């Protein structure tokens, strides 16, 4: 899978170059990396004394025009910084996991960083990825990595050995592949698309993700839907939950699979899917432990082909004592089962293999890895599901190649939309410039004619005439400023036209916009 390959390659490249120093170890921090390059000098208030602080503030403010002159031909970068099941073990991923209800706070903290304009967090059991629009690629990446290090308690140097960092079209393609299920442990699984949708819903409920990130995620959803509708990538595809059930069946004696006593802890979305796939395997009964009975009742109402027995969370260990297989899928940030718990559980019958199976699909994990040290217990987590999904690898690669055509089409549409944003300030400035002239000349004309000589209809007709003339005159220039992928005009041609109009009418939009961004960030830092 393309995204996974890129991610793994990035992590590998860092490890190989680490000994040669920071520049060699982090080529993605210094490479030009395509058309969209941007940067901004970091503006920090310095000095403890008031005079020193004031001097630093003045110096920072004076750097506006220097920074704008240096970077006015450049553009903010879209970046993704993250790790996944392909690049990092679950022990690291669980430390970085951000609960869904904390996404808004994480976004707020990220966008408060000096060089980050927009941000989004995608945190699942298999990945933790941060998408940002950075005013400066180098500084933005460094700030995000430092934020991740601070939140997880993992040194930045250790994090970089597992992180992948992708820029602009590579970052966008990666998100589209994630949404389509191409970067999932289980190719084509549907839950990741729902999780990408939740990022957008979460952003809408908390004040928005920012123009670029919001559009990118919405286009990623479109790409994910198209891949599933126009290819057979989802045919026979398994989810993390179904892979967990399959793994349990593989480890049980074949003759006893259907008679095994099944226990599920957690009745959320993942847990519900576990029940669904147990039914598909022919299981007739499952015990579900959950904090409240309402969710269990809802599952029971929907799935009538299996007997579902509810037990409260306070009876979890008693329920585990009566189970051959224990599936855990909760949002608990602490372990539910440790080695000490497993040691006091009664042994399993030899007919069932003599081993109690714990299949933990939670991140952070619910079951300690040390359980496997107990003679009659074995624990499997999400990383162990690779054993299940490695089957049919050739078919997985073929399906991924079919889906890439759709991914490329949607990527081009997004890139065309983003390219068109470069000319929007110029279009607005040109329209405003023309309208000011129109209004001024119209006022002169009306004064010459005299208000007493005009009725409302005549005045409206003259105003409409002036507006029509301006629109006709602007139509040609504005057409040459549009770059939405609908014609053969290249971005370079469009930008050349934009710069020409800026010079002719002294619009100087790019520089003004960037100066405003720098000023806003500096004032925020100084306050």
UniProtKB/Swiss-Prot annotation:
Its main location: plastid. The record marks 174 as: Important for activity. It is an enzyme of class 1 (oxidoreductase). It comes from the Eukaryota. It is found in: Plastid, Chloroplast. Pathway: Porphyrin-containing compound metabolism; protoporphyrin-IX biosynthesis; 5-aminolevulinate from L-glutamyl-tRNA(Glu): step 1/2. GO terms for biological process: chlorophyll biosynthetic process; protoporphyrinogen IX biosynthetic process. Its EC number is 1.2.1.70. Residues 1-43 form a transit peptide. Keywords: Chlorophyll biosynthesis, Chloroplast, NADP, Oxidoreductase, Plastid, Porphyrin biosynthesis, Transit peptide. One of its GO terms (cellular component) is chloroplast. NCBIfam families: hemA. Was shown to bind heme, but the precise role of heme is unclear. During catalysis, the active site Cys acts as a nucleophile attacking the alpha-carbonyl group of tRNA-bound glutamate with the formation of a thioester intermediate between enzyme and glutamate, and the concomitant release of tRNA(Glu). The thioester intermediate is finally reduced by direct hydride transfer from NADPH, to form the product GSA. Homodimer. Catalyzes the NADPH-dependent reduction of glutamyl-tRNA(Glu) to glutamate 1-semialdehyde (GSA). This is Glutamyl-tRNA reductase 1, chloroplastic. The gene is HEMA1.
């Amino acid at each position: 899978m393309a995204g996974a390959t890129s991610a793994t390659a990035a992590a590998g490249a860092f490890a190989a170059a680490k000994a040669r120093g920071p520049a060699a170890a982090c080529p993605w921090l210094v490479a030009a990396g395509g058309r969209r390059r941007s940067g901004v000098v970091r503006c920090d208030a310095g000095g403890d004394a008031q005079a020193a602080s004031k001097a630093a503030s003045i110096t920072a403010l004076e750097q506006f025009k220097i920074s704008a002159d240096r970077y006015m031909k450049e553009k903010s970068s879209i970046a993704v910084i993250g790790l996944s099941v392909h690049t990092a073990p679950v022990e690291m991923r669980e430390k970085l996991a951000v609960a869904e209800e904390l996404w808004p706070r994480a976004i707020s903290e990220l966008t408060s960083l000096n060089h980050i304009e927009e941000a989004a967090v995608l945190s699942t059991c298999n990945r933790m990825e941060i998408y940002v629009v950075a005013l400066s690629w180098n500084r933005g990446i460094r700030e995000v990595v430092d934020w991740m290090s601070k939140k997880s308690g993992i040194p930045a140097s250790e994090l970089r050995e597992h992180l992948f960092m992708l820029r602009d079209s590579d970052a966008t393609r990666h998100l589209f592949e994630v949404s389509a299920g191409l970067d999932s442990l289980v190719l084509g699984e549907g839950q990741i698309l729902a999780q990408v949708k939740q990022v957008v819903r979460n952003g809408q409920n908390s004040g928005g993700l920012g123009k670029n990130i919001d559009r990118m995620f919405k286009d990623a959803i479109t790409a994910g839907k198209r891949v599933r509708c126009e290819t057979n990538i989802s045919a026979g595809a398994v989810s993390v939950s179904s892979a967990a059930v399959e793994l349990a069946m593989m480890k049980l004696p074949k003759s006893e699979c259907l008679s095994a006593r099944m226990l599920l802890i957690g009745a959320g979305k993942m847990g519900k899917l576990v029940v669904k796939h147990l039914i598909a395997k022919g299981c007739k009964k499952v015990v579900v432990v959950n904090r409240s009975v309402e969710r269990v009742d809802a599952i029971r109402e929907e799935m009538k082909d299996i007997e579902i027995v509810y037990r409260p969370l306070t009876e979890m260990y008693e329920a585990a004592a009566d189970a051959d297989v224990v599936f855990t899928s909760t949002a608990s940030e602490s372990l539910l089962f440790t080695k000490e718990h497993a040691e006091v559980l009664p042994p399993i019958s030899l007919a069932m293999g003599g081993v109690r199976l714990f299949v933990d699909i939670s991140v952070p994990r619910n079951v300690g890895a040390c359980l496997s040290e107990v003679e009659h217990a074995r624990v499997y987590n999400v990383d162990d599901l690779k054993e299940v999904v490695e089957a049919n690898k050739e078919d997985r690669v073929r399906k991924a190649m079919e889906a890439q055509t759709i991914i490329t089409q949607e990527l081009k549409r997004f890139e065309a939309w983003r390219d068109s944003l470069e000319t929007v300030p110029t279009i607005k400035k040109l329209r405003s410039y023309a309208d000011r002239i129109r209004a001024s000349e119209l006022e002169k004309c009306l004064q010459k004619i005299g208000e007493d000589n005009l009725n409302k209809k005549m005045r409206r007709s003259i105003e409409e005439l002036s507006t029509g003339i301006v629109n006709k005159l602007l139509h040609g220039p504005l057409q040459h400023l549009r770059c939405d992928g609908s014609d053969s005009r290249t971005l370079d041609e469009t930008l050349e036209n934009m710069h020409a109009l800026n010079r002719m009418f002294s619009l100087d939009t790019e520089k003004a916009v960037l100066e405003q961004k720098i000023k806003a960030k500096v004032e925020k830092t100084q306050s």
